[in-house]
Amino acid sequence: MNKLIFAAAAAAFTALATPLAAAPLAEARPEEVGFSTSGLARMDDFFAREIAAKRVPGAVVAIARDGKLVHYKAYGQLDPVKGTPMPLDAIFALASMTKPMAAVAGLTLMEQGRLPLQAKLADYYPAFADMKVGVVQADGALKLEPQARPILIHDLYRHTSGLMYGGRPDSASPVARLYPDGIAPAIEGDTQAFIERITKLPLAHQPGTQFEYGFSIDVLGAVIEKVSEQRLGEYLAANVWKPLGMNDATFAPSDAQRPRLARPFPNDPLTGKPQAIRLLDTVTKSDCGGACSFATIGDYIRFGQMLLNGGELDGARVLSPKTVHHMTANHLGPEIKNMVANVEPHRAGFGFGLGVAVRTSEGLSAVPGNPGELSWNGAFGTQFFCDPKERLVVVVGTAAPGELRKYYREQVQDIVYGAMVK
């Protein structure tokens, strides 16, 4: 009986898959690039179970090896309230998967000699020079101390500026309680208002001493705007998105794009509490480089393949191979406290490069992979990783803003490596 029930659920799940859309990369049979077709079918089974259990509305998964797409499927529903089937060209709120793209934008300016890593942040926005460091005393009070050294542009890329996010379960210090959540400043004001707001807060740590996940890449986006004299979205469109053929990437979905926005369940399947992705229905007043972009999974796998190729895709070069190599090296030296695994438990054995997490060790992590793997994810349910040793890029989109998103990241990576036979 259980087999019959599962077969029926799988059939219903398969019926919700979208008709074929244009593939974002050349395609190959799994066996041609070292995958097992039956192994990759476990991805279908996994999402069939999750959708049948109403733990996630739907997903889009893209897997490429050797530059060839071997798995590109849509599962379940785009909008669980309306019952709309999930299309391959669904548009996802990327949240922090915006950060690697903003980092690439900054590195294009570095290559032009316009934004060196060792530049002082205060050279672009002087108010950062006056920020103090909040040191928590034994009685819980904050003592404000001067910066031991200035915040550098380098600190923004690797999250060692001392800036943080509020509203995160891994950031519950007295300093964190003073900070807004990741998207609030972009909803409430423009770039200048964001800078004025953030520079009135204390830093969580002395610059260059500890990895602290937060607004660093948002500030980098503001610096990019200052240097380029363009909005971040305009600069990304001209220098990253359009050259790579990322046709739906944007900070402001158009009226034509909005019907393709992936939406979550109204209530968190784990807690039963109301949940929402505010950016789906709220126009931001600034292009926040840390959290506010949208794209399809097909768009983002082209971005990932560009990085895996050393900065080029289909004849369009975005960065030099040497710059990509520098970006994807670990920039957390022994003098810096590495708290990357605090953001996500499965990131033991990871350091951090310029806008991406970088695996530095065999073992340690809860998920398979190789040293040199680069990745980052989004709080609304998106996932991205590249494994240069395996010539592999994987991008996943779900609308799952609760804690379930972390479960999917681990399970998907387990399934992908389990399907690799060569």
Feature-to-residue mapping (PLM):
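Positively charged n-region of N-terminal signal peptides that target proteins for export
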Residues: 1-4
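Bacterial N-terminal signal peptides
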Residues: 7-19
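Short, surface-exposed loop or secondary-structure junction motifs
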Residues: 26, 123-126, 131-371
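Short, conserved catalytic-motif segment at the N-terminal edge
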Residues: 26-94, 116, 131-137, 278, ...
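Short, conserved phosphate/pyrophosphate- and ester-handling motifs at nucleotide-, phospho-/glycolipid
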Residues: 36, 99, 296
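Active-site SXXK
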Residues: 44-48, 61, 67, 92-124, ...
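Short, well-ordered beta-strand elements
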Residues: 384-385, 391-400
